[in-house]
Amino acid sequence: MASKRITQETFDAAVRENIEEFEMGTEEAIREAVEQFESQGVDLSNIVKTIPKVSLDGLQEPTHSVLQALNDLQESLTGSRLQEVSAHLVRFCDQCKQQKASRYLAAQKGAYPILLAAWQLAATSNQGLLLQALNALAVLTDGQPDLLDAQGLHLLVATLAQNAANTELTCCGIRCVRHVCLKHEQNRQDLVKAGVLPLLTAAITQHGQHADVVREACWALRVMTFDDDIRVPFGHAHEHAKMIVQENKGLKVLIEAARAFSDNPGVLSELCSTLSRLAVRNEFCQEVIDLGGLGILVTLLADCNDHQDLVKQVLSALRAIAGNDDVKDAIVRAGGTESIVAAMTRHLASPQVCEQSCAALCVLALRKPDNSRVIIEGGGALAALQAMKAHPQEAGVQKQACMLIRNLVSRSQVFSKPILDLGAEELILQARAAHPDCEDVAKAALRDLGCRVELRELWTGKKGDLAL
């Protein structure tokens, strides 16, 4: 059942009542109001839990700091006082950054059209002011993508196109794109139609020495491939990934950027994460190889083993491109299996690295007996079982390890005994008992290992009907 909601005014009135009628102190009054509403099942996540303040001139009704900043901004815009507009934009932005509730309250009180007016005023006269307006809009739309309208969308694309050489404006504009597209499929589709994809890939190329721009552009490109909006039956994630690769040379752009940032683990993590989102077709996986991407990934896995997040993203990218059977063999020939096993062993305490390592090895072993032999001889099965022991409560690790073991032996029964001798059966049975999600994969692994498996009929016929 959906949580109950109240307005900011209702909460403020309750706090004021506690102070005036029950003579409570400020903190006690707020705490009492919070407890009162939460006991009634009210969601207060979008409520500012402070006392409204009196304005500096004392002429206005007490209001929250973010709304005071918004009112002052609107007044300065009415008089086109650019210096004051600049100061109030900074102040408003600082208030919105403090908490989600402040952004929500500002949006409820008409902040978006006011920022749009500041944006339009700055676009024709002042790049410094334009940057401040864009920054404020990026903060306001964080978690509130519904605010974007058609006017703002076209203004955003035009701003990116007209200021492509400006590093700060490009970075801030792309951050706006990311915020308004996250969990909003219609905004994604509309921005793609308006031509945002070539602007994103061009930003990586044009600002290839600026880590912040590359990081933001990668993040925005990934968001374009998300299917995270529960309000639509299906999205265009696959189509957007195809457009990024085929029409905008996305893979080439990312791989060239990886070469340029070879000593920056943070940027490399973003690039690898984006690469894995774009490897959605067989030919795209092969293109990564043709562009020299495999060598970069394997080298990163070997040379950057100390950077856990980068290791995780490289493993994810290897897993993605290994969907192509020819690429599987290329990864094995390049020494990828040894590097994956080494990464899992090095980061055995990390469930995320263990899960991604098992998943990557699982894909490499699928339908490939020769690859299975290389993995087992390189200690892959042992490492996977060690990961299962280290993370018994992590369903993802248990599931991927079971799938890996199944793939290792499904076409190479000769490997069953060595894996069983390592204690695989007991670990798989434990995973099956502890995690319902592992039921099918655990059963498949036990079956292909030659262990006794109790099979249960899911459906039985009864006088022409199916019954569970």
Curated annotation (Swiss-Prot):
Protein name per UniProt: Armadillo repeat-containing protein 6
GO terms (BP aspect): hematopoietic progenitor cell differentiation
Domain of life from the UniProt record: Eukaryota
Organism: Mus musculus
ARM repeat locations: 195-239, 249-293, 294-336, 337-379
PTM section of the record: Methylated at His-238 by METTL9.
Residue ranges of the TM segments: none
UniProt modified residues of type Pros-methylhistidine: 238
GO cellular component: cytosol
Pfam (any one): Arm
Family to which this protein belongs: Belongs to the ARMC6 family.
Record keywords: Methylation, Phosphoprotein, Repeat
